[in-house]
């Protein structure tokens, strides 16, 4: 997510997930496979959260930016951060539609 532009969207996504009982483990953690926006835990499952924001549909919907390659890299990043690949990991996305003054959130589980 772009540094300053997307920071507010990431803050809103984090607030939303914390309100749903998620626990933050790492934020903006870099790995050899890319950056993980939010690495969280919920009910004993590790959760990698990708946050995507779009002010308008001009450049496509936020979900369109999460390609199969991105999903693969997120899973590789999770395994790297955990140091093993036998723990339950779920990939999720928080899509932020709009601007800081007028937005809505969409929360999805990504298929592996």
Swiss-Prot record:
Which stretch is the leader sequence?
none
A single Gene Ontology MF term assigned here is: nucleic acid binding
Tell me the superkingdom of the source: Bacteria
Q: Per its UniProt record, what Gene3D superfamilies does this chain match?
A: 3.40.1350.10
What InterPro entries has UniProt attached to this entry? Restrct_endonuc-II-like, tRNA_endonuc-like_dom_sf, UPF0102_YraN-like
**Family in the record:** Belongs to the UPF0102 family.
Q: Which HAMAP family match?
A: UPF0102
Q: What is this protein called?
A: UPF0102 protein TTHA0372
Tell me what organism the protein belongs to. Answer: Thermus thermophilus (strain ATCC 27634 / DSM 579 / HB8)
> What is this organism's lineage?
Bacteria, Thermotogati, Deinococcota, Deinococci, Thermales
